[in-house]
């Protein structure tokens, strides 16, 4: 009977080039397949147009649920409207979308609060600092972390933002971006990165310039 058919669950994350999303997908797969259901995973590789197309393909695969981590929290909306029209519920993880009415629920950390904690830690360990930001401007989670950090430092003039660059949350992008800033003479006391891969990239660039031991990341 139709009731006995396995559920088909589609997932698409902003990139599988981040171990964080690989772990999430592996844990989902363990639970879903243990119930006899089917997980269909897609990787847009940080391309929102590609992610929108993947979602359309998943709809053609007759999925019953979409688990989503959007590449761009605004540009995902056309695909979400198609999913809503198809009557498929959406669970957003580790980020948000610009129109929450298009999803069933959102599961995310307090990213703004995480940024606040990073700023507080920096102020507790340093009397002053010139800071570089390594960002990911198209993701709400990344934006919120940086915003929480900046808002917390705003009333402390001894902590100044002297440069910023977008890494798309990727090690291989963060490294040359940090290198570019250093070559421009922008030498920070601290670097605030939105995630672990971008921090590793920034650290690699600082290491090449002999600055890692002098810089808080």
Region roles according to the model:
Residues 1-9, 33, 126-127, 189:
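Immediate post-signal peptide segment of exported/extracytoplasmic ligand-binding proteins
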Residues 33-35, 83-88, 152-160, 184-187, ...:
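Short helix-capping segments at alpha-helix termini
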Residues 27, 54, 75-82, 148, ...:
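A short acidic, amphipathic alpha-helical/loop segment
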Residues 10-11, 63-70, 89-93, 132-133, ...:
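Periplasmic-binding protein-like
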